Amino acid sequence: MESIPARLNAVQEKILDLYEADSNDLNAQIEHWKLTRMECVLFYKAKELGITHIGHQVVPPMAVSKAKACQAIELQLALEALNKTQYSTDGWTLQQTSLEMWRAEPQKYFKKHGYTITVQYDNDKNNTMDYTNWKEIYLLGECECTIVEGQVDYYGLYYWCDGEKIYFVKFSNDAKQYCVTGVWEVHVGGQVIVCPASVSSNEVSTTETAVHLCTETSKTSAVSVGAKDTHLQPPQKRRRPDVTDSRNTKYPNNLLRGQQSVDSTTRGLVTATECTNKGRVAHTTCTAPIIHLKGDPNSLKCLRYRVKTHKSLYVQISSTWHWTSNECTNNKLGIVTITYSDETQRQQFLKTVKIPNTVQVIQGVMSL
């Protein structure tokens, strides 16, 4: 029992030395969390032995010591991973590597250079909330670290990661509690972001724009099909189709002969005879084996870079994407899709490429 107070005193002395030194060396911050973990371990053991006081300190409950030890381990591991990147020498203080900073949104990322954004709910100066945005957010993956800048719009605070807009603060969540009218203003850097025009007032213009874009796409496809006359032809009436399905719905014969469709894509449709994957022909299109890699977007980004060193083991690989829905879904998980020429190539890929346990592998097929 005598050794626990002595060891605890030594650990706490070292922690105080780090506080007084106030170093911006990352190794010092790693040491700080190592010592914090050891302090919690000693408190845990003391309580287990029935010790209630060590000097003037009350020994906390075992559950408290265990929880704080887990937090210290989490910070220590994150800092050790950061220490392996090119940003290890940027200068890191105790405040920047504190538990409070680690838990601030976006959680479990290191952040620097915060600034305040004020949201005025109901356009009432007495009904405001302050939020912190960050000029530097360190997205720490398994093999690399990327710095992104926090941004703001009417809907919340966000950053871009691998082409994906990720909100880490949504003002609508607080609006449910503090807002009556459902309208607010965002004040940042002397500028005010107000509520955008309602969807209903723009329905006509939005529809017209969509139709215009579709028309332009069709025209472009028509040119790229390769007709001898490169001038755009005016729209013509479709020929009466002469193929009928079970519901008396008719389709042009030329679509079933694998000819290119001007108003769809420039690739055209692949017939059953043209498809190399004859075992999976459906609706006259060619299907290919695929896998979906599902997990944390940063882990997927890192994995995608590793996969690119095995280009002979797949055909195409997508950027990180995710499902969007009005229902409650975990949009924080990203998905990367990889296509293969055949089943043999997919199996060879899975045998060769090491995929982390944190990434879920979903096999399937996709029409191309």
Curated annotation (Swiss-Prot):
The keyword Ubl conjugation applies. One of its GO terms (cellular component) is host cell nucleus. Signal peptide: none annotated. Keywords: Activator, DNA replication, DNA-binding, Early protein, Host nucleus, Isopeptide bond, Phosphoprotein, Repressor, Transcription, Transcription regulation, Ubl conjugation. Its main location: host cell. InterPro entries: E2/EBNA1_C_sf, Nucleotide-bd_a/b_plait_sf, Papillomavirus_E2_C, PPV_E2_N, Reg_prot_E2, Regulatory_protein_E2_N, Regulatory_protein_E2_N_1, Regulatory_protein_E2_N_2. Pfam families: PPV_E2_C (PF00511), PPV_E2_N (PF00508). Residues 1-200 are annotated as: Transactivation domain. Residues 225-255 are annotated as: Disordered. The keyword Cell membrane does not apply. Residues 287-368 are annotated as: DNA-binding domain. GO terms for molecular function: DNA binding; DNA-binding transcription factor activity; nucleotide binding. Transmembrane segments: none annotated. There is a cross-link at residue 294 (Glycyl lysine isopeptide (Lys-Gly) (interchain with G-Cter in SUMO)). GO terms for biological process: DNA replication; DNA-templated transcription; regulation of DNA replication; viral DNA genome replication. Phosphorylated. Belongs to the papillomaviridae E2 protein family. This is Regulatory protein E2. The gene is E2.
